[in-house]
């Protein structure tokens, strides 16, 4: 959901969630900023006013945002560390046009729908992966993860603000387990703060099971209702499932194991093959490009069904 907010000569448009809003709010109040809403959009904008372009070094979350400074006649754009939130842009006659979806850019007069040969080659060769910053359309770019950009009269200037560093691992096995547990719990519980109905996707795999475990424990420990969890299945999958080295058991075995032992309210969404086929084009349109076919259509149908009851879901998904 895109949020907007203005303060003085500054205007922000923002998509995402900041997980350390409380810490940022404390610092803002120390510096005589008044916070009038419960929105992280206000906190983000006023943090930018306080820290300038260095604000990205203080953010813990997933985000893509743009801030206009009408006094400086300057736009500041930034994307989160791992590129969870998308941000695309193009330049038309020295005018910066940006959006969370490529299709939105084409609504601006002068933005042409021309395929890029290099982008198409990557689509067929390594798709859905691609070279960071590129798309399948000419002159349509994505702001790379962990980058910010400044657009003013001198043009567009892009800079890397963070890079994952490799360090020698010196901790013992026990210390490693303790640290990993702490980091996972901290990360997951921070993301459980939501004004909207929240759930987790549960496939029975390691990632979704870990997320669901910590999230359900949080609900139980804080006297909240059981955590809603969702999984996907297919008509006649129980009859047609074939074991392999890659998948020796059906997902349902592990899903049932988790839901029986955790504080959850589980929902299973069952999809039929014709639905998958009928949704292939819709899934491609949603992505703005061809993707992983049946996987994308499954995810689209799954999310549409979950959206009937939920707004926010914690899940492990590949960044775009």
Stretches found by the model and what they are:
Residues 1-286, 299, 303:
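Cysteine-centered catalytic environments shared across enzyme families
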Residues 279, 293, 301-320:
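Active-site adenylate/phosphate-handling loop in enzymes that bind or generate adenylated species
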């Amino acid at each position: 959901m895109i949020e907007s907010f203005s303060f003085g000569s500054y205007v922000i448009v923002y998509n995402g969630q900041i997980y350390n809003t409380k810490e940022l709010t404390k610092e803002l109040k120390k510096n005589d900023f008044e916070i009038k809403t419960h929105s992280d959009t206000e906190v983000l904008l006023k943090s930018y006013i306080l820290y300038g372009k260095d604000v990205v070094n203080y953010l813990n979350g997933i985000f893509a945002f743009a801030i206009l400074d009408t006094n400086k006649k300057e736009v500041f754009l930034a994307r989160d560390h791992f590129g969870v939130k998308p941000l695309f842009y193009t330049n038309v006659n020295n005018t910066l046009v940006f959006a969370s979806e490529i299709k939105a850019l084409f609504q601006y007069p002068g933005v042409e729908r021309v395929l890029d040969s290099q982008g198409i080659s990557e689509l067929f060769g390594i798709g859905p992966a691609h070279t960071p910053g590129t798309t399948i359309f000419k002159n349509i770019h994505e702001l790379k993860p962990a980058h910010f950009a400044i657009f003013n009269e001198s043009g567009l200037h892009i800079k890397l603000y963070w890079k994952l560093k490799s360090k020698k691992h010196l901790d013992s096995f026990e210390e490693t387990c303790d640290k990993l547990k702490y980091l996972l719990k901290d990360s997951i519980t921070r993301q459980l703060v939501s004004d909207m109905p929240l759930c987790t996707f549960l496939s029975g795999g390691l990632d979704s099971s870990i997320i669901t475990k910590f999230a359900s424990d949080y609900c139980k420990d804080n006297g909240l209702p059981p955590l809603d969890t969702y999984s996907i299945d297919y008509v006649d999958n129980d009859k047609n499932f074939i074991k392999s080295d890659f998948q020796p058991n059906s997902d349902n075995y592990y899903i049932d194991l988790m839901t029986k032992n955790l504080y959850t309210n589980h929902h299973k969404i069952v999809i039929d093959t014709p639905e998958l086929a009928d949704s292939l084009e819709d899934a491609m349109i949603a992505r703005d490009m061809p993707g992983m076919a049946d996987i994308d259509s499954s995810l689209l149908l799954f999310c549409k069904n979950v959206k009937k009851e939920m707004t926010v879901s914690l899940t492990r998904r590949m960044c775009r």
